[in-house]
UniProtKB/Swiss-Prot annotation:
InterPro entries: CAP/MinC_C, MinC, MinC_C_sf, MinC_N, Septum_form_inhib_MinC_C. It comes from Tolumonas auensis (strain DSM 9187 / NBRC 110442 / TA 4). The lineage of its organism: Bacteria, Pseudomonadati, Pseudomonadota, Gammaproteobacteria, Aeromonadales. Interacts with MinD and FtsZ. Disulfide bonds: none annotated. Cell division inhibitor that blocks the formation of polar Z ring septums. Rapidly oscillates between the poles of the cell to destabilize FtsZ filaments that have formed before they mature into polar Z rings. Prevents FtsZ polymerization. Keywords: Cell cycle, Cell division, Septation. Belongs to the MinC family. This is Probable septum site-determining protein MinC. The keyword NADP does not apply.
Length: 251
């Protein structure tokens, strides 16, 4: 049989991990639905890994999977399996057995001292794209900056493969997605997903942080996990060593 057109390659994906302290399907479903309501589009059919490390008994994986699917997540595997019996039970439920990965610690938020504001005007962003030390700009490979005049209303979604600049505010229920960085000159109340294609150097800038969700290269925080000192402040958000970093900005 010819193998032309088929190829196996290794890859890395960022996925949400559900840590179980007990295995009550109703409570699992309630928790997931509550989280999904904070960012419906972000969690719509999102892959989910089940961490069973804290469980002392073999759970009913079929019922847990049903609860997860009802909450509109997709269970893809389990991690933290400590016995052959639990491993077999997971396999019988058609769940992959995953080794423990490097998880993002959403509680370990690094707070930096205030620094000079590094907001960029749209023209400055275009200049950065066109020139970098030791290189010559190739106009054919440039990704233009998307500039949105005014506010982004609830229910709107803005996407760009390049940087996104919002000259107004982003309302609750609105979503900004960029493969690069996101600049919001007003208040960020909705969702901002930078580095959507895995760009760990992408950043999020906003004049007033009240976001429902912020995400960089798949690493995310919901509104209830944002560090209190930065809520309502002018901030720069970046990713360093798999941790989301918040920097205060000054005018």
């Amino acid at each position: 049989m010819s193998e032309r057109g088929y190829e196996l390659k290794g890859s890395v994906f960022t996925m949400t991990v559900l840590h179980l302290e007990d295995a009550i399907p109703e409570q699992i479903q309630q928790l997931l639905e509550q989280k999904a309501s904070q960012a419906p589009k972000f969690f719509d059919s999102a892959p989910l890994v089940i961490n069973v490390e804290m469980l002392t008994e073999i759970p009913d994986f079929s019922k847990i999977m049903s609860a997860i699917l009802t909450a509109n997540f997709i269970p893809v595997g389990v991690t933290g399996v400590k016995s052959n019996e639990m491993r077999e039970a997971a396999k019988q439920a058609r769940l992959a057995i995953l080794t423990a990965g490097k998880e993002t610690n959403t509680d370990a938020v690094v707070l930096h001292t205030p620094k000079e504001s590094i907001y960029k005007t749209p023209s400055e962003l275009r200049e950065e794209q066109q020139t970098s030390p030791g290189t010559t700009a190739d106009p054919d490979n440039l990704v233009p900056t998307k500039v949105v005049q005014g506010n982004v209303r609830s229910g709107q979604q803005i996407y760009s493969p390049g940087p996104v600049v919002i000259l107004g505010s982003v309302s609750n229920g609105a979503e900004i997605i960029s493969n690069d960085s996101i600049h919001v000159y007003g208040t960020l109340r909705g969702r901002a997903l930078a580095g959507a294609r895995g760009n760990h150097d992408a950043r999020i800038f906003c004049g007033h942080l009240e976001a429902e969700l912020i995400s960089i290269a798949g690493h995310y925080l919901l509104s209830d996990s944002l560090p209190e000192p930065h809520v309502g402040q002018e901030v720069q958000i970046s990713l360093e060593n798999e941790k989301i970093i918040f920097d205060k900005l000054t005018s």
